[in-house]
Amino acid sequence: MDGAEQTPGGGVMQNARHPKTHRELCELACRFLRNNGFKVVFSDRFHAWTSCGEHPDALGFRNGASCLIEVKCSRSDFLADRKKVFRSEPEKGMGDWRFYLCEPGVITVADLPAGWGLLYAINGRVRKVHGWPGNHQWVVTVAKPFRANKQAECDYLFSALRRLEIRGVTENGADADRVQTYGL
């Protein structure tokens, strides 16, 4: 954990406000992805069929890379996550890069499965605790900690595009703000 997450006395910083809900943390994760170069982002409100059964809390795409953020509000939720098939068999999961987002104290770097990164939500902002790559590393194949299930990602994207077509989103993008705001 870097110094930004510790108090001068060595304790862990806590949020000044009440703990965030799962929905609030998912929205924070999506904003964070958009602010970090992921121009196509889906929140947990978007439900799509995938071949692996995974329903990401936040999934972002940029040229050459995908990033999954899994939100955890409690330690028990984090521990239960390990039982999911796409966690025990990472090749079945989505995201070339995968991160947990939680409030400080729920998950530590020592708790992370191999290849996973950690982000903390502190006072409405996301702090990069472990594993967030530099801008040039996103597309370097050997730097990617996971080989994402590209079929599942394509299923997910197809479902999104199909919904746009069904809803009649205009070619000139006039409805783009509505789509981004409401998660399709």
Regions found by a protein language model. Give the residues of each.
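Non-catalytic C-terminal interaction segments of nucleic acid-processing enzymes
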Residues: 2-35, 110-184
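A short acidic/basic microdomain associated with nuclease active sites
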Residues: 34-51
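Conserved beta-strand termini and adjacent loop/short-helix elements that scaffold enzyme active sites
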Residues: 43-44, 101-103, 121-123, 129
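Anionic group-transfer/hydrolysis microenvironments
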Residues: 46, 59, 72
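A short, well-structured beta->alpha microelement
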Residues: 52-53, 75
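Active-site beta-strand-loop-beta-strand hairpin of nuclease catalytic cores
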Residues: 56-68
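Catalytic cores of nucleic-acid endonucleases
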Residues: 66, 72-121
